[in-house]
């Protein structure tokens, strides 16, 4: 079992360039997901969704992202989500509820909770701070 674990871990080191390429593709897919309006039709992006696009298993994809970025794939996706949310909050006059729905949230309260946990203030508070 130890041998298997060492082999599994070593592949992340020996395939560093390939892994970087996968991360670049992941970032492109993530951008396309939000720019293409997919959140409204498909909901919040998932690790499985992007792993499928990369032709990798969700577990392997998650391990790869963690090794290369130091963040889990879910944290990485959520970071991008918050980044897009900040742009929407500052770049539009839409209500927080509209932004939440555009980003794929079923409930605006869930969006507000995640935003506040990540940024330290509510979306409305963030908008007020930037004005």
Predicted feature residues:
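Helix-turn-helix DNA-binding motif, specifically the short coil turn and the N-cap/start of the second
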Residues: 57, 106-107
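Short hydrophobic/aromatic patch on the recognition helix
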Residues: 61, 110-111, 115
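Terminal helix-turn-helix DNA-binding modules in bacterial transcription factors
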Residues: 68-106, 128-131
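DNA-binding recognition helix and immediately preceding turn/loop
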Residues: 22-74, 92-101
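An amphipathic alpha-helical interaction segment
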Residues: 1-31
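Residues within the DNA-recognition helix of helix-turn-helix
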Residues: 64, 81, 114
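…primarily DNA-binding HTH/wHTH and HhH modules…
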Residues: 113-131
């Amino acid at each position: 079992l130890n041998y298997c674990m060492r082999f599994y871990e070593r592949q992340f080191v020996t395939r560093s360039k390939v892994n970087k390429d996968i991360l670049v593709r992941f970032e492109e897919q993530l951008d396309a997901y939000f720019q293409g309006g997919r959140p409204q039709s498909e909901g919040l992006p998932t690790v499985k969704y992007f792993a499928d696009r990369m032709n990798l298993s969700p577990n392997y994809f998650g391990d790869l992202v963690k090794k290369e970025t130091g963040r889990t794939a879910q944290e990485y996706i959520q970071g991008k989500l918050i980044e897009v949310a900040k742009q929407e909050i500052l770049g539009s006059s839409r209500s927080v509820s509209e932004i939440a729905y555009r980003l794929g949230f079923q409930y605006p309260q869930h969006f507000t909770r995640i935003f506040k946990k990540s940024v330290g203030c509510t979306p409305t508070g963030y908008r007020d701070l930037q004005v």
